[in-house]
Amino acid sequence: MAINRGNIAKQLLPGLNAVFGLEYGSIEDEHVPLFEIENSDRAFEEEVLFTGFGEAPTKSEGAAVQYDSASESFTSRYSHETVALAFAVTEEAMEDNLYDTFAKIRARGLARAMATTRQVKAANVFNNGFNANFAGGDGVAFFSNSHPVVGGTQDNLLAASDLSETTLETALIAVQNTQDDRGILTGTRAESLHIPPNLQFTAEKILASTLSTTPVHFGFASNGTGPTNKDGVTNVNDVNAIRSMGMLPRGYFVNHRFTDTNAYFIKTDVPNGAKMFVRAPLATKMEPDFDTGNLRFKARERYSFGFSDWRSYYGASPA
């Protein structure tokens, strides 16, 4: 239904000091640090994992060399979605509106709506990342302790412990122990931490503090002798190893569309991980309807979000 003069009755008369509701800011492009972004020229994109070789065995003198084999494993598919939104305005409403409302709706309202959908879809790759109903190409959730590999399973699911200096150190060790499908260490390093707004102050304290933020227990024995035991922040000269060693060189990023207020994710330097494919970039159109005189405005884009190599991220979802 087109927006008509009945929808904008106050804006047909002079004297309004302001028409508000269209001037709000927006939170956009939070998907950029999460995803590798590529263009696409087809209906869908596929990426296949190719397993390499295992460790080379020792060859005895005079013995035949041992052969190994490599093969394709699972395939990840990115099916592009079309996202579009439109509105129409009657010819009379356009003529009689005194406050240029429709220009603002076209410039800001459509862009805001399209950007919000894009950010929500991007964040949902992680919001659904612990749910087996949203499996990746290998048949399990993005963050799982049972990713199938040659000869067994591997995991990128961190312990369900709240974000702290200690749990982050443990997670960073797990990242460095990442192996390929044949069990060979990949030399993986962490790049950045990704969190909901609820954890931003915790992350800032952990990553920006020069000294350790790990709480310690000090006092006398727990049998009750001596002063009452107390918990406090360490007052010894322990460095913040995460910061001093540069373990997260890109720091942390807040994503306001993460729905789990306790979950956190570590991005690694493994390529071909979380990806966004852009099939058709955002475009807007305006055209009149000859019969009614209504003006119609439309915004449209096509893209897909997903992941290929699960080793690109480690995630935790504390209760």
PLM regions and their residue ranges:
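Assembly/oligomerization interface modules of large self-assembling protein complexes
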Residues: 22-83
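Short low-complexity stretches enriched in small and charged residues
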Residues: 2-6, 37-46, 64-67, 89, ...
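A contiguous catalytic/ligand-binding core that recognizes phosphate-bearing ligands
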Residues: 99-180
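Solvent-exposed, flexible loop/coil residues
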Residues: 54, 71, 82, 93, ...
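Flexible, glycine/charged-enriched surface loops at secondary-structure junctions
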Residues: 183-185
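N-terminal alpha-helical "arm" segments
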Residues: 1-27
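Sequence/fold signature of self-assembling virion shell proteins
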Residues: 2-10, 143-177, 187-192, 198-319
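Long, contiguous amphipathic alpha-helices that act as assembly "spine/axial" helices in icosahedral shell
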Residues: 75-133, 193, 293, 297-299
